[in-house]
Amino acid sequence: MTNLLFLFDDCKKFIVRIGEDGFIEECKKHSAAPCRIIALNGLNEEPQVGAVIVMERAQRLHVIKPYESLQSVCEYYGVLEDELLEYNAISYIYPYQIVEIP
């Protein structure tokens, strides 16, 4: 269960206490990229259950840059490749395509 502790004025960042499901599940609940949350909090590893961290909502739309691959986009947002493709009803990505992040 998520304990929302504080919502920043810009509504893009907020503070949560990591619930029993763990850090990755908490990121999924808030559509946040795990690697970005770790960096945002200045951590070297995933926070443990009970830790209080700043979360940031991920962008819901992403424009594919010419140098990006499906793998790199999915790693950035912490989603599976099949998830991203299925969510957007596509079978591949191409430069300047706009995709919605699940």
How would you describe each model-predicted region?
Residues 2-30, 51-77, 97:
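Primarily a LysM-type cell-wall glycan-binding module
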Residues 99-101:
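Solvent-exposed segments in extracellular or luminal domains encompassing
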Residues 38-42, 83-88:
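Short alpha-helix capping/helix-loop boundary micro-motifs
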Residues 1-3, 36-39:
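Terminal low-complexity, poorly structured segments
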